[in-house]
Amino acid sequence: MDSRFFIVFADILLPLLLGMALRRWGLSREILRMVIKANVVCVATFLSLVSFWSVHVTKELLWLPISIIPICFIPVLIFYGFQKNRFQNPLDQGSYMISMMLGNIGTLAGLCAYVLYGEKGFAYVQLIAVPQILVIVLFCFPMAQRFYEMGAQRTMETKRTSFIKLLLTPNQLPALGVAAGLLLSGFHVERPQAVGTLFTILIHVSAWMGMMPVGYDLRLGSVGTYAFKLWPIFPVKFILLPTVLYGLTTLFVTDPAMMTCVVLSAGAPTAIFAVAAAQLYGLNVDLAESSFVTTTLAFLFVLYPLVYWWVEFGVM
């Protein structure tokens, strides 16, 4: 088996374990916050710029950002149609819905796409991941606030960050990196070879910088409490969404790499943003963390190997 297959496991599981160890060793949370900021503002922006520097805009490429709509909102329809009453407490319901709809696309699906297709695959996935930021700000945060108010049984005004402040933050700089990379590609600016070499190194650095703080905040004791109660998330994320998105993508796309990147993004496990939203809006954090851990393990040990062999054996 190609050694590239194991890169994803090393870049996801090892920094998670390191983050947990750093918490035990008493590392300051402020240091981890600086790591997060440096990753988003500097490293992720550079990776977005460089990966899109080599992408040529086509009509098929336009489907990638549009595909985030069914990826995120099919789970919402399923939640309201079949799953809302699975939990009675609105704080549980809010965490459950957000855990079902948000995927770890930018980091985990992006890393898998890079292993399979190089910079091109990473760029394709980022075109799907960047619009998810808008979904989080425009839909997830307001819905989290709504479930919080329902759970608190009151509608008193609470101090929340304004929409403009949520949207216009340094966390959105990778989107500017995408735009800058596309401009450089459009004007046929030659990319230095050293930039590609640095990209190869930094994509792994970015994964470690992104997952280490997650491990630092993770409380494994919460995982077992909700693990079996969250089973409906698994067929939605790992069977329904990849199947539906593959079918939709074949209507607009002929490039096998794009198809695979959409499938990886559709099957991405619960995003750490789901945990962050639960923390920010007072929802059930334990439920969101349980979904994050269990779906991430299922993705790494089931879906990712299937997609990897699917590509390696020439099906795609």
Residue ranges and their predicted role:
Residues 1-316:
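Alpha-helical transmembrane segments of multi-pass small-molecule/ion transporters
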